[in-house]
Swiss-Prot record:
Family: Belongs to the RimP family.
Originating species: Saccharophagus degradans (strain 2-40 / ATCC 43961 / DSM 17024)
Function, as annotated: Required for maturation of 30S ribosomal subunits.
Compartment(s): Cytoplasm
Protein name: Ribosome maturation factor RimP
Native organism taxonomy: Bacteria, Pseudomonadati, Pseudomonadota, Gammaproteobacteria, Cellvibrionales
Keyword Ion transport: no
Length: 151
């Protein structure tokens, strides 16, 4: 996770958790000429519109005071959804047995994109099974990952 995203997470996770939600993660991207800050929240009983509204209101207040994002930005708050992004090793551990898709920061074994069954998480490595071949991928190389829902 980039430095600015790490600072935002440290600033905003306690706000989300104080409202009874789990801070799942965040994405900070450029969208045209302004930034887009996406915050993903989770709740055991499921995330409702009211949860998103409450988190958005409180996070907006903190961002207005702290002003960590230069220029204009859009704030979005939502549940991670069925195709949820995976940000931490704990997230990967929760979804062992599921199909995941991920992109690496740099090539590993000649490729950057992988999609397969998440079979294990050991130490700081994620293990994927793709076409009967096992890939052991260092977590620090993962740029983006998400669960691929089954229909």
């Amino acid at each position: 996770m980039a430095g600015k995203e790490t600072r935002l997470e440290k600033m905003l996770a306690p706000v989300v958790e104080s409202l009874g939600c789990e801070f799942w993660g965040l994405e900070l991207r450029m969208q045209g000429k302004q930034s887009l800050l996406r915050i993903f929240i989770e709740k055991e009983a499921g995330v409702g519109v009211e949860d998103c509204e409450n988190v958005s209101r409180q996070v907006s207040a903190v961002l207005d005071v702290e002003d960590p994002i230069s220029g204009e930005y859009t704030l979005e708050v939502s549940s991670p959804g069925m195709d949820r992004p995976l940000f931490t090793l704990d997230h990967f551990t929760r979804f062992v047995g599921e199909h995941v898709s991920l992109r690496l920061r740099t090539a590993f074994d000649g490729r950057r994109n992988f999609s397969g069954k998440l079979t294990a998480v050991e130490d700081d490595e994620v293990i994927l099974l793709i076409d009967a071949e096992e890939y052991i991928l260092p977590f620090e190389l993962i740029d983006k990952a998400q669960v691929v829902p089954k229909f």
